[in-house]
Every structure is written in structure tokens, then in C-alpha cells.
Amino acid sequence: MPKYLTTLYKRTIKRNIILFKKLGKDFDEKKFILLLIIIAAIPLLISYYLHLTLKSMIIFVVIYVGAALFIPSILYENKIETLENNIPQALYIMILALESGRSINEALLEVVKSNIKEVSDIFRKVLYLMENQKLSFEESMTIVSNLYDSKVLRMLARIMIENRKYGGDLSDSLKILAKTLEDFKMYKRQLLSVTASGLAIGFIILCGVIPAVAALLGAYLIAVSGMLSGVAPIPPVKPEDISKGFEIVQMGTAIIGALFAIPIFGLKIGRMFLISAVTMTIGVLAYYTILKFAPGIFS
């Protein structure tokens, strides 16, 4: 296999299989490749049935397969986001345990008993390494924190390790970290709430209303050209014209989806592909459904 194909395979298929394992999903390479083939085949069949242009077919395949390739990384990002959002809750439990005179190990055990999503599993692994593998606290925290792509978790591990090494009041350090994380979460939520309403209105108009209006106009022209055939010099609406309109709606809604993803998630290619797939699907469904059934209204 050529070197560039090997590199591409590692960065797509292999990387996604690793992410599935981190997510606890039993998914091997053959299953994932088969899933991609099915996802690519569905838009091909739809394009053939609807007599779409080659360009529309390519756009369908690229957007849907691209979204499928990024779904494992998106799921993993969601897992890390849940972890980081729940860390402050775990920190307050640890603070209460430490202030009551318990050790770090006992504080970690309290978090494990609390069953905090994602966080309890991490501290359970730390305790397992310390009790069963006889590793030190510093080694256990370093190993477990490096298993996750979370800057917040690594920061927490570093604070706890440095405090244990050089001394100090760990509960005060954890209070500062918990308050900082909560403030950041609140600012992020406020920023999203400010932009969400405007984005929602724009989403409805650009991905639903405009394709629907375009389809209504097309349906009207189809009905009028059929009724006045041979009477008025109105050229008939050809299948090529419908396919061209479908292509414009498809490209427009896909681009809009990619642009909408940026203010919500940042410049993340995976999210842009996923939102593009959603907006494109909504747009083309609105266009095709109305174009299919609306001519009867005008006839």
C-alpha cells in the first residue's frame, strides 16, 4: 500500500477505532469500514432514484461520509466535556472530606462512592493502581490523567501532585480551581445563550423557509407550464432545472451549516461536517417534499 494511503488509513480508520475503545465501544476496523460503505451507498441510491446531478451525488457522499468519520471524535469530545463539567462537583466532595480530616485517598473514595459521571471512574482507576498495582499516588494520578485528553484533569493532577510533594493546604487549592471552572462554565453558557436565539431564527429561515419558498416557486412554474402548454410561450420546466435547483439548495444549506457551527463549537471540522449534514438534509427534504406535492395545489 502506498505511503500516503497508509497515513490516511491511520488518521481515519485506525484513529477512530482507538477512539471507540476509549469510549468503551466494541467496534473493529471491518465494522467501521462497512458502516462507511453503507453510508456512502445510501446517498448514491437516493441520487440515482431522484435523477440528481453528479455534483449533487458527490456532495451527498462527501458530507455524509465526512460526518461519519468525525462522529467518534465528537462523541469523545462530549465525553471529555462531561468530565470537565463534573469535576467541580467532585472537587467540592473532596474539599469536604479533606476539611473533615480525611486523607487524599479517602477523599478520592468519597468521589467514587458519589457516582459522578466520568469523574468517579477516573478516581476509581487511580485507587486501583495504588491498591492493586502498588503504585504511588503521584504515579497513579500521572498515568490516569494522561489517558484522557483533558487539560482540566491534567491541571488537577498537577495541583494534587505538587501539593503532596511540597506541602500546603490542598483544600484551598481545590476551592480556587472549582470556583474558576464554575465561572468559566457560567461565562460559556451566557455567551451561548446570547447567540443561540439569533442562530435559531437564522437556521429556520435559511435551512427551512428559503428552500420551501424555492420549492413552492418551482411547483408553481411546473403547474403553470403544464396548464398553458401550447397556449403561452412559457418554456416547460425540465428535470434538469429541478436537479439544478436541488443542487443549489443542497450546496447552500451545507455551507450555512458549516458557518453556523463556528460560533457554537469553534473552528472544529468535525462539528462543521455534522451540522452541515443536518442542515443539508433539512433543506433538501423541505425542497423536494414541497416540490413533489405542491403542484397539485396550483392545478
Curated annotation (Swiss-Prot):
Q: Which residues cross the membrane?
A: 32-52, 56-76, 199-219, 220-240, 246-266, 273-293
Q: How does it sit in the membrane?
A: Multi-pass membrane protein
Disulfide-linked positions: none
According to its record, what are the GO cellular component terms?
A: plasma membrane
Sorted alphabetically, the keyword list is: Cell membrane, Membrane, Transmembrane, Transmembrane helix
Q: InterPro entries attached here?
A: T2SS_GspF_dom
State a single Pfam family of this protein. T2SSF
Q: Does the keyword Membrane apply?
A: yes
Name its cellular compartments: Cell membrane
Keyword rRNA-binding listed? The answer is: no
- State the name under which the record lists this protein: Uncharacterized protein MJ0779
Q: Which organism is it from?
A: Methanocaldococcus jannaschii (strain ATCC 43067 / DSM 2661 / JAL-1 / JCM 10045 / NBRC 100440) (Methanococcus jannaschii)
